[in-house]
Amino acid sequence: MAREFSLENTRNIGIMAHIDAGKTTTTERILFYTGRVHKIGETHEGSATMDWMEQEQERGITITSAATTAQWKGHRINIIDTPGHVDFTVEVERSLRVLDGAITVLDAQSGVEPQTETVWRQATTYGVPRIVFVNKMDKIGADFLYAVKTLHDRLQANAYPVQLPIGAEDQFTGIIDLVEMCAYHYHDDLGKNIERIEIPEDYRDLAEEYHGKLIEAVAELDEELMMKYLEGEEITKEELKAAIRKATINVEFYPVFCGSAFKNKGVQLLLDGVVDYLPSPLDIPAIRGIIPDTEEEVAREARDDAPFSALAFKIMTDPYVGKLTFFRVYSGTLDSGSYVMNSTKRKRERIGRLLQMHANHRQEISTVYAGDIAAAVGLKETTTGDTLCDEKNLVILESMQFPEPVISVAIEPKSKADQDKMGQALQKLQEEDPTFRAHTDPETGQTIISGMGELHLDIIVDRMRREFKVEANVGAPQVAYRETFRQSAQVEGKFIRQSGGRGQYGHVWIEFTPNERGKGFEFENAIVGGVVPKEYVPAVQAGLEEAMQNGVLAGYPVVDIKAKLFDGSYHDVDSSEMAFKIAASMALKNAAAKCEPVLLEPIMKVEVVIPEEYLGDIMGDITSRRGRVEGMEARGNAQVVRAMVPMAEMFGYATSLRSNTQGRGTFSMVFDHYEEVPKNIADEIIKKNKGE
């Protein structure tokens, strides 16, 4: 099957936003207008096409990023709908990694919200060009220019309107195009009857003003345009469009569109914007990777005749076809039934079937081409972040970094039958979601699951029940504390056993020093003259890493320390890797007395939005939770309080906020950093853990 759409006419985009800004509804409308869906699905009715997991339809939020493909004006647009809830940040992170551009959806009343800041930061990290869609223009309190201002104030983004709304709230009837300098009027609620008209007289001056501002903003980024502008020459529509496209692709400029997806207004013009301003796979730099054996850096051009390379960005278990691996093809082509190399794991994999996904309905295809996003059936070894490539041209593309989980709960199967199925369910869920971990506590024998927040774990337990038919009891949440050292010290670890038969001998001197917060564990071998033979050094490092899993204070993992192996001794006959491993772990235990170990706890960045009259109560409540208020601002007639609060104090906060504000307050939180636990609280935690 030949290529249906050229690379120039392909767009790989994501739709990202704060929860409830209307991402899924926007995607639904895109699918409706591109002829993919015959009846529009509504999120609040639980029938949206992209929200295809049962839990999503019940909760009205998007959890997994469903990938779908649509066609518009001779272009193929591959869309990934990403969740806006902070607990699912990893889904956003992994879809951004494989996208070429994105639409950021804002709520016209709220503008930029906390989760918008998080996803915006992530998109900036990956250098993803964006256009902005100010949605919900029909909502009470909708204010387009306020929303644009929040882009400048909160994100320092060089964002300018390429459209203006005609009216707002229930008077929102049309849109002015500031590039073409014309207007569009909507005649009905399905938004299909759209008429191109002259700009209404009473909007003429405003349109001229913002047209001028747009040209000025774009000219600043384009020398040729700047010269014409300064010399007073007329800038044509084509020149303006080309300059906006160039600046957007260079991530220097963000065009802002407006509309109401729910009322079907502005979506077709937004699709035009995707085609006009977001990059094709050819417009962005070729992806770079490393040749495994030589560590040499290479580029993989987005061409069908280049060697095949792709990145697996999502694993899903499908009830009908089993394990689905979603991947983005960066170069070359791939046929179903062929073999590829998973260069990350050095395993050969056979591609069973290739599927193009449309939310949850699938179409089988025989070949995928450079720039495509598709799913494969039959990959056994591949997990999220792995590179798939041509067997003769190995390359490893940059993988993805995932945050460590910050919350854990113990779960117990309700019956013996559940116990057998639970292990399998947890394994499959871990394959799908790299921020979800499950392990058995060696001391209590309990199964502990860890994730990014309470909602994340709720949904995991829910999925176990529905998809894997596992009933489980869930314990109270536990915080992922860590331990670290405050002081430096030189410590000895000696393991000697010589009683009949072959003995054991391992002896090390290690200098422990505190490392910067967040830098993790660093090991240095400073042995001179072979007092500890080279072959035992890795055993010393492994012994330390193992011992660090159970800290000296309260059994929590030890982080952010440096260990320098500088002396020791060995025995020709009795020394072994095992002996040195044990000696190293003894050194770590001995360090407890000298290095002043302390407990660390996760601190969450919290943003609470409340009516002004509750401000005093909420501030008092945050302080009582050991929180530090970092700032406040008015947003419309509400107050926004930003604070840093220990995670341990945030359990059940949703309920308490509801009762404190008669249900009128909302909050969001995201993990920020680890900080030392105050001594009186640390003592209690240590006591509890030692069962005193």
From Swiss-Prot:
UniProt keywords, alphabetically: Cytoplasm, Elongation factor, GTP-binding, Nucleotide-binding, Protein biosynthesis
Domain of life: Bacteria
InterPro entries, sorted: EF-G-like_DII, EFG_II, EFG_III, EFG_III/V, EFG_IV, EFG_V, EFG_V-like, G_TR_CS
SUPFAM superfamilies noted in UniProt: EF-G C-terminal domain-like (SSF54980), P-loop containing nucleoside triphosphate hydrolases (SSF52540), Ribosomal protein S5 domain 2-like (SSF54211), Translation proteins (SSF50447)
Gene3D superfamilies assigned: 3.30.230.10, 3.30.70.240, Elongation Factor G (Translational Gtpase), domain 3, P-loop containing nucleotide triphosphate hydrolases, Translation factors
GO biological process, one term: ribosome disassembly
Task performed by this protein: Catalyzes the GTP-dependent ribosomal translocation step during translation elongation. During this step, the ribosome changes from the pre-translocational (PRE) to the post-translocational (POST) state as the newly formed A-site-bound peptidyl-tRNA and P-site-bound deacylated tRNA move to the P and E sites, respectively. Catalyzes the coordinated movement of the two tRNA molecules, the mRNA and conformational changes in the ribosome.
Identification of the protein by name: Elongation factor G
Organism the protein comes from: Geobacillus thermodenitrificans (strain NG80-2)
Lineage of the species this protein comes from: Bacteria, Bacillati, Bacillota, Bacilli, Bacillales
